[in-house]
């Protein structure tokens, strides 16, 4: 039975990713940007939290791009999502690629937090918060899922004019990097808002990095510029 908490999802957002599910592992598809940034975010997470031997949860795992990579770094990874088709793609890829120590479940972060509180060394929630009706609820669940002293990593889009121009006008309408309608500007989250969400539930900010894209070279890099895409590293207050 679906619980109230598991309804923190926009049906239209689920439909978007379900329609594109078969493209998740096509590096020339709409998911090409995720494949391009994956090594950067993976290395950043690993540099701060050391994945090897850790129990990791990837919230909003989609087709498993990050979950698969973290498992290959030596972590035992659970990917959680509510998009059935995307999860099937993730499971099939793990089987075909023989990825060790990775599994997937169709469950919300909120419901998993009730089932397995304080169970993970590391929780990641990447490129998801801007797609849900209640991001604070997701942040709260992530804080409940991680062990005291454990790490929670987020990535999302800042909310300002530059982010609107680059992430929506540029990426969706001019360059065609993403399908039109992928993002809604009103759902973008400023770093200060996300930091506030975290502090309310015992997550202390440890690091923040911007993610820059050069449309000419089609390359990405981490930087101090957080005006568009950014990654936030937090730690759960130890008891």
Regions found by a protein language model. Give the residues of each.
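A short acidic, Gly/Pro-enriched loop at the edge of an enzyme's catalytic core
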Residues: 113-122
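A short glycine-rich, Lys/Arg-flanked "PGG" loop and its adjoining helix->strand segment in the class I
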Residues: 136-148
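N-terminal, positively charged/glycine-rich alpha-helical extensions of SAM-dependent methyltransferases
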Residues: 1-25
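Acceptor-substrate binding/catalytic loop of class I
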Residues: 176-193
